[in-house]
From Swiss-Prot:
GO terms for biological process: rRNA processing. It comes from Coccidioides immitis (strain RS) (Valley fever fungus). A motif (DEAD box) lies at residues 259-262. Residues 1-91 are annotated as: Disordered. ATP-binding RNA helicase involved in 40S ribosomal subunit biogenesis and is required for the normal formation of 18S rRNAs through pre-rRNA processing at A0, A1 and A2 sites. Required for vegetative growth. Its EC number is 3.6.4.13. This is ATP-dependent RNA helicase DBP8. Residues 137-316 form the Helicase ATP-binding domain. It catalyses: ATP + H2O = ADP + phosphate + H(+). Residues 348-498 form the Helicase C-terminal domain. It is an enzyme of class 3 (hydrolase).
Length: 536
């Protein structure tokens, strides 16, 4: 193509036309002020006589833009290849039914659960049933009463929640099921699990526990929720004091669950059995309902229920106790240790133990036998620089809930607790359990150490042993069928660190400050509060 010629006739036209930097440079002539451009510029009509057979029109390239708004294709190209391109999208609750239909050959489907329920469990990454779930779910779906025993962390909640939701979805009405559990924290956890599993459906669960106002709970009960999760004491209070309109729906309950049945049916001081009997009195008789009992430690009181007389038209009670390959009641992935300490310096030994290289980053639960000890340790460890919170029965319910939420969210690394945290709580991140006080009952030890090494994970339990605790340790070893080993860490001498580092003085000063704060009636943040009262 011939180069285009542009002539300048006026003085102002002697200026060279501005050329964009991205276009090729022009070649200028010296004779007639002629500029020869090697690239096709924007076409300009010079005269009426210009032939229509001029060079074809070539559009000018757009100017570079400063806008930060880019096309999606440009953004994808800039980011490069997607590393997760081969991975499936996250499963939402809306996809649960379709997921269940596509997974009819899965293990949960073979147990007889509805497709929507199988899909919902898959959305929660629960795809393979555990031994207790494989044993109990089919029998519960047949309508049999059930007594299920399995060690901690084996999935007992799903073992009764899944069949309850399956049968409820077939005939949803009123108060379909009641779940009784000994602690508020465990009741809250079960309540949240029911909501999560039933997300594709319109289940209405309600939580009835102490520490909260009774009026809103009574209103919630009167609206006929589908599932009631409660502690026996508070539900018994409603049965005794609330009107008949509030508890009327309880007389049509189809299914009843006693979770941690060994604790609910235990007799003696602090027994919950009277409250449990009050709750059961408001429900249909045992011949008209299905009763499910689950526990990690099957006691004689629980086993005795198997031999109770039953009508001829009722199926026999299904009883299963899931044993492991080594026939123990604690996970095989749990390492049990003991550490001998002088009774007068237990706090200093605990402080150094939690500060070693192996334990300094582990989320841990520290169990005490008394609420006053737990309160003191919370204040003392806080002064020694640990991120700590507490959980015991003297705290208001709002504080108990918030403290547990902080620990779950890793805002606090240590949780100082009494046995209210020993049962049922599922916090997978816990890697260490410390028994500051040796439990008096070996079954309590089983529940305490069961807060770690859950679902096949590894965990460690360390028990601080004084001179008077030897017989308790021997009883625990006989109960669990395994011996504890002496705790040790390479290159670490706790006694040496305490002596050389002068930690006894630091810990002693922190303890005096904590005791003074308690005497003044202040909380862990130094605020003056009223004396805490224990509520049901």
């Amino acid at each position: 193509m011939a180069p285009r010629i542009e002539r300048h006739t006026g003085p102002e036209e002697d200026r060279e036309e501005e050329i964009h930097s991205h276009q090729s440079p022009s070649v200028s002539g010296d004779d007639d002020g002629v500029e020869i451009s090697e690239r096709p510029p924007k076409r300009r009509r010079l005269s009426d006589s210009e032939s229509s057979e001029d060079d074809p029109f070539v559009p000018q390239q757009p100017l570079p833009t400063l806008s930060r708004i880019k096309k999606k294709s440009d953004l994808s190209a800039a980011k490069g290849p997607d590393r997760n391109a081969d991975q499936p999208d996250p499963v939402t609750a809306k996809d649960a039914f379709a997921m269940g239909l596509q997974s009819m050959d899965s293990s949960f489907s073979s147990l007889g659960l509805a497709p929507w329920l199988v899909g919902s469990l898959s959305a929660m990454a629960i795809r393979r049933p555990t031994a207790i779930q494989r044993a109990c779910i089919p029998e519960i779906l047949k309508g049999r009463d059930c007594i299920g025993g399995s060690r901690t962390g084996s999935g007992k909640t799903v073992a009764f929640a899944a069949p309850i939701l399956h049968r409820w979805s077939e005939d949803p009405f009123g108060i379909f099921a009641v779940v009784l559990t000994p602690t508020r924290e465990l009741a809250l956890q079960i309540f949240e699990q029911f909501k999560a599993i039933s997300a594709p459906q319109s289940l209405k669960p309600v939580l009835i526990t102490g520490g909260s106002e009774m009026r809103p709970q009574a209103i919630a009960l009167s609206t006929r929720p589908h599932v009631v999760i409660a502690t026996p004491g508070r539900l018994a209070d409603h049965i005794k004091t609330s009107g008949q309109d509030t508890i009327y729906g309880l007389n049509r309950v189809r299914m009843v669950v006693l979770d941690e049945a060994d604790r609910l049916l235990a007799s003696g001081p602090g027994s919950m059995l009277p409250d449990v009997e009050t709750c059961l009195s408001a429900l249909p008789p045992s011949t008209s309902r299905q009763t499910l009992l689950f526990t990690a430690t099957v006691t004689q009181e629980v086993r005795a229920l198997k031999s109770m007389p039953r009508p001829k038209d009722r199926l026999p009670i299904f009883v299963t106790e899931i044993s492991t390959e080594n026939n123990t009641t604690i996970p095989p992935t749990l390492k049990q240790c003991y550490l001998q300490v002088p009774m007068t310096h237990r706090e200093a030994f605990l402080h150094v133990l939690l500060s070693t290289d192996a334990n300094s980053s582990k989320p841990a639960i520290i169990f005490c036998n008394r609420t006053k000890t737990a309160d003191l340790l919370d204040r003392l460890l806080r002064r020694l620089g640990h991120r700590v919170t507490s959980l015991h029965s003297l705290l208001p319910q709002s504080e108990r809930t918030s403290n547990l939420a902080r620990f779950r969210a890793s805002a606090a690394r240590l949780l100082v607790a009494t046995d209210v945290a020993a049962r049922g709580l599922d916090i997978p991140s816990v890697g260490l359990v410390v028994n500051f006080d040796v439990p008096r009952n070996p079954d309590d030890y089983i529940h305490r150490v069961g807060r770690t090494a859950r679902a096949g994970r590894e965990g460690e339990a360390i028990t601080l042993v004084g001179q008077r605790d030897v017989q308790l340790v021997l009883a625990i070893e006989e109960r669990v069928g395994r011996q504890m080993v002496a705790w040790e860490e390479e290159g670490v001498s706790i006694e040496g660190r305490i002596v050389r580092g002068g930690l006894l003085k630091d810990v002693g000063g922190a303890k005096r400050e904590a005791l003074g704060e308690i005497e003044e009636g202040r909380d862990v943040l130094g605020r003056r509060v009223r004396k805490l009262k224990k509520t049901r």
